[in-house]
């Protein structure tokens, strides 16, 4: 596609400076370091740096146009200037990659917790039902044979559209996307045409980014506002906000749940260390179901995935129930470590609600006389209001070993002290070094205890103010256990 074609009929408020020639566009990018001839440079202003400061370098490296919110009279190339830069970026990216979402069945999952598990479950079921799918999410982006880890739950528009286009090129027929509230607010998902929207749950998170809980909910509502009247709005009907989300969309409502009446409802729940058994009720029929994923919150995740697949693909419900028995949890989601002297789990839980769900689940698995030992911290430069609450959650269920998560720009000791201010009882220990914290937790555990290492899950790094180091909770656990042999 050439520059003239790309800019033709763009309906975002934008002004073009310079002569538009039919020169071929090679790429859309925000990285001035990797610019080549034929690229369009998008000069975004971020928290840490301003892309406009690198526009001249981008032009020197071969950029044929610059997209920005600020006109630069010293640039010798075409400039596309708009006050709605994020929407303009989304529209240009979608057009450049030939609107790939129109060629896929696109499922968007939003919610404070559960997005990753639900997205992996849907991909698993879609693939099993001959609907080969890609995935864009927190752990990785799966684009056919290509797997990418870039650290973004919801990538920026240029990358997101590029990934969707790669799925089309790889002959995939569906895309499952984790849609974060931040990604929605920053318009990263604008010009993605969703066929299905899924709501897992809504609890406190990201209040460092959103002004209030109401604004956080409003952000998530955007996904459902994007659905057409032929789409599906799949909502957890046990949520207080369920009605609000269903009223915000033109799409066909589909509900799931445990406590309230729903299109897909679980009853007669039984839990064990080997998973959950329940009766799935749909239109008066009962389907006995076994899931290897433990905990009530994972029953909700399974229900969401079944509802989406059954409604969208019209698969046999009994077939889906049978498939669920062989699902596997995503990496770092209540992931068991098999070689320990007691049960050890790695989990990504980093919000009060997620931590409560995981601790509650694991406590039910404790043998008589056993205790739950929880290693956890809180991320730096993130919502500080949840730090005390995290301590209060863990205190309900067991012994806490408070440590560092990803301190980022904050002092680790300050974060730990803020967490510990939430404890009422002195049933905790402090080990700021995360490896030492894991070592200590394992050293005090008996064979009747359960150890939970929470907060980082699948992550293989730890972020400090001046450096990011390699750090994998699973590897550290194995290293500590091997030292006992």
UniProtKB/Swiss-Prot annotation:
Cofactor requirement: Mg(2+)
Post-translational modification, as annotated: Carboxylation is probably crucial for Mg(2+) binding and, consequently, for the gamma-phosphate positioning of ATP.
Reaction catalyzed: UDP-N-acetyl-alpha-D-muramoyl-L-alanyl-D-glutamate + meso-2,6-diaminopimelate + ATP = UDP-N-acetyl-alpha-D-muramoyl-L-alanyl-gamma-D-glutamyl-meso-2,6-diaminopimelate + ADP + phosphate + H(+)
Compartments where found: Cytoplasm
A GO CC term attached to the entry: cytoplasm
GO annotation (BP), single: regulation of cell shape
GO MF, one annotated term: ATP binding
Keyword RNA-binding: no
This protein's UniProt keywords: ATP-binding, Cell cycle, Cell division, Cell shape, Cell wall biogenesis/degradation, Cytoplasm, Ligase, Magnesium, Nucleotide-binding, Peptidoglycan synthesis
Binding site for UDP-N-acetyl-alpha-D-muramoyl-L-alanyl-D-glutamate: 32, 153-154, 180, 188
UniProt keyword Nucleotide-binding present: yes
Coiled-coil residue spans: none
Modified residues (N6-carboxylysine): 220
Highest taxon, organism lineage: Bacteria
EC number: 6.3.2.13
Binding positions for meso-2,6-diaminopimelate per the UniProt entry: 382, 405-408, 455, 459
Pathway(s) annotated for this protein in UniProt: Cell wall biogenesis; peptidoglycan biosynthesis
Binding site for ATP: 111-117
Pfam family, one: Mur_ligase_M
UniProt enzyme class: ligase
Main localisation: cytoplasm
Function noted in UniProt: Catalyzes the addition of meso-diaminopimelic acid to the nucleotide precursor UDP-N-acetylmuramoyl-L-alanyl-D-glutamate (UMAG) in the biosynthesis of bacterial cell-wall peptidoglycan.
Recorded family membership: Belongs to the MurCDEF family. MurE subfamily.
Protein name according to UniProt: UDP-N-acetylmuramoyl-L-alanyl-D-glutamate--2,6-diaminopimelate ligase
């Amino acid at each position: 596609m050439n520059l003239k074609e790309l800019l033709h009929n763009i309906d975002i408020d934008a002004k073009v400076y310079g002569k538009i020639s039919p020169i071929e566009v090679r790429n859309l990018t925000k990285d001035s370091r990797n610019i080549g001839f034929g690229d369009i440079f998008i000069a975004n202003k971020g928290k840490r740096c301003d892309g406009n400061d690198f526009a001249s370098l981008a032009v020197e490296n071969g950029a044929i146009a610059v997209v920005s919110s600020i006109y630069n009279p010293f640039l010798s190339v075409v400039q596309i200037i708009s006050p709605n830069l994020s929407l303009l970026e989304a529209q240009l990216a979608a057009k450049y990659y030939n609107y790939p979402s129109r060629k896929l069945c696109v499922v968007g999952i939003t919610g404070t917790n559960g997005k990753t598990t639900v997205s992996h479950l849907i991909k698993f079921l879609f693939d099993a039902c001959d609907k080969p799918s890609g995935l864009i999410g927190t752990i990785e982006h799966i684009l056919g044979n290509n797997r990418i880890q870039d650290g973004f739950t919801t990538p920026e528009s240029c990358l997101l559209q590029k990934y969707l286009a790669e799925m089309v090129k790889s002959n995939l027929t569906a895309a499952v996307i984790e849609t974060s509230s931040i990604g929605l607010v920053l318009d990263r998902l604008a010009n993605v045409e969703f066929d299905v929207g899924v709501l897992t749950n809504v609890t406190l998170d990201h209040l460092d980014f959103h002004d209030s809980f109401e604004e956080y909910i409003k952000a998530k509502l955007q996904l459902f506002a994007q659905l057409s009247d032929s789409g599906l709005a799949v909502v957890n009907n046990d949520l207080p906000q369920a009605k609000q989300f269903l009223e915000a969309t033109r799409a066909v409502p589909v509900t799931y749940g445990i406590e309230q009446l729903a299109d897909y409802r679980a009853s007669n729940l039984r839990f064990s260390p080997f998973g959950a058994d329940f009766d799935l009720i749909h239109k008066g029929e009962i389907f006995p179901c076994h899931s290897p994923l433990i905990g009530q919150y994972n029953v909700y995740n399974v229900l969401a995935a079944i509802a989406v697949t059954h409604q969208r693909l019209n698969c046999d419900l009994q077939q889906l129930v049978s498939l669920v028995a062989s699902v596997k949890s995503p990496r770092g989601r209540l992931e068991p470590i098999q070689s320990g002297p007691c049960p050890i789990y790695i989990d990504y839980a980093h919000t009060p609600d997620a931590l409560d769900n995981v601790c509650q689940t694991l406590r039910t698995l404790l043998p008589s006389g056993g205790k739950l030992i929880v290693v956890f911290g809180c991320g730096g430069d993130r919502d500080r209001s949840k730090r005390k609450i995290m301590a209060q959650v863990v205190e309900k269920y067991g012994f806490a070993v408070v440590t560092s998560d990803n301190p980022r720009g904050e002092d680790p000791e300050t974060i730990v002290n803020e967490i510990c201010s939430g404890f009422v009882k002195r049933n905790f220990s402090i080990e700021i070094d995360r490896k030492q914290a894991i070592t200590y937790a394992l050293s005090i555990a008996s064979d009747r205890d359960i150890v939970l290492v929470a907060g980082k899950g699948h992550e293989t790094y730890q972020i400090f103010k001046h450096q990011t180091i390699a750090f994998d909770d699973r590897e550290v656990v194995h290293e500590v256990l091997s030292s006992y042999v």
